[in-house]
A protein has these predicted regions:
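A membrane-interface helix-boundary motif in multi-pass transporters
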Residues: 90-103, 292-313
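Helix-to-loop junctions at the C-terminal end of transmembrane segments
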Residues: 1-6, 197-211, 294
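Cytoplasmic helix-loop-helix junction between adjacent transmembrane helices
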Residues: 37-76
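C-terminal transmembrane helical hairpin of 12-TM major facilitator-type secondary transporters
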Residues: 212-255
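Short amphipathic helix-loop junctions that connect adjacent transmembrane helices
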Residues: 166-183
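Conserved MFS/SLC helix-loop-helix module at the cytosolic interface between two early adjacent transmembrane helices
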Residues: 1-29
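Juxtamembrane intracellular "pre-TM" segments in multi-pass secondary transporters
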Residues: 117-153, 175
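Multi-pass alpha-helical transporter architecture, strongest
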Residues: 109-115, 307-332
Length: 332
């Protein structure tokens, strides 16, 4: 939709939907209305995909990894601050976190409507592309040179990322006896380190090593961190591994930049929408698989899930070897 009608109107509709959703949840008289609010939010929830496409529109190809990293860093900060603010407000009033979220989305909506200009590449989708079905558009993306292996890598990273997202606190409490406070500090530290790496490490790494090698470095760091965590028995080790996991966070911005190079300007929204769908799919499937495997192996091999996640990264190596820069890059 954003490729056809422009980023700005789709962003406005998406943010307006989020605002309405939180207002509805704040005033919900029953659980049914909470579900209705969540369904409505799901229908209009495209802001991250469209925002990423917008960044791709206004950024030269050789700087996209840096901008995607900054976008990820900002998202990470929100991921850390949001639960803290919600927890504090929830102690005062159970409805307050939802009203606060609606208020912040409302401010975001006003700023988007007043300050955000349409990106230069929006509305460039040709009539032929507009008439294509969704399946045909997806087929086009997947069959582009390099895109299939890069999408495979993205899906693997998405699935692997569900291991710490799902198990970090549970594993810390089971394996190391973390208190709720220590678990919270460790989770916040994990997010802060990731945000710092994405904000400040991605640009110099891409400049020095290139996007492909930066992606490889990020995967290697994350895999090593996962392997070491799988055998760690001391409670301080996860904290010591945070820099490795943080460097692992540079992989996704570099990968996004590589994929955006291989797609024409008129298809950037489709690409980011597909990646957003992969993220959603991973968030649905990942936790179920991760928790099931963890509780099956917890007694005999508590660190097996982390080791298997690291081993899963091995699949990315032959996929990455197939990558070659294609005609849309414009940059050697």
């Amino acid at each position: 939709l954003s490729d056809r009608f422009g980023r700005r109107p789709v962003l406005i509709i998406s943010i307006a939907g989020a605002t309405a959703d939180y207002l509805l949840m704040a005033a919900a008289p029953s659980l049914l209305w909470l579900y209705i609010g969540r369904i409505f939010a799901g229908i209009t929830g495209a802001n991250m995909a469209v925002a990423t496409a917008y960044v791709s529109d206004i950024t030269p190809a050789h700087e996209r990894a840096k901008r995607f990293g900054l976008l990820g860093a900002v998202f990470g900060i929100g991921f850390i601050a949001g639960p803290v603010i919600g927890g504090v407000l929830g102690e005062w009033n159970l409805h307050a976190p939802f009203f606060a979220a609606a208020f912040m989305n409302g401010i975001n909506l006003i700023m988007t409507a007043v300050l955000l200009k349409e990106s230069k590449h929006s509305n460039k989708m040709t009539e032929k592309v507009q008439e294509q079905s969704i399946l045909k558009k997806l087929s086009y993306l997947i069959t582009q040179p390099n895109m299939a292996p890069l999408l495979g890598i993205f899906l693997i990273i998405t699935l692997v990322s569900q291991v710490p997202a799902t198990l970090w606190v549970i594993y810390g409490q089971d394996r190391y006896g973390w208190s709720i406070f220590i678990a919270g500090v460790s989770l916040a530290s994990y997010g802060i380190c990731h945000s710092i790496a994405q904000a400040f490490a991605i640009a110099p790494m891409v400049k020095r090593f290139g996007e492909k090698n930066t992606l490889l470095c990020g995967i290697a760091c994350d895999a090593i961190g996962l392997l070491l965590l799988s055998i760690a028995v001391e409670e301080w080790v996860p904290f010591a591994l945070l820099p490795l996991f943080a460097l692992g966070g540079v992989a996704v911005p570099a990968l996004q930049a590589m994929m955006s190079r291989g797609i024409s300007d008129e298809r950037q929204g489709e690409l980011q929408g597909l990646l957003s769908s992969f993220n959603s799919l991973g968030a649905i499937i990942g936790p179920v698989l991760v928790t099931s495997l963890y509780f099956m192996t917890q007694a005999s091999a508590p660190g097996m899930v982390w080791a298997l996640a690291a081993i899963l990264y091995v699949i990315t190596l032959p996929l990455l070897l197939k990558y070659r820069l294609n005609k849309y890059s414009g940059v050697p």
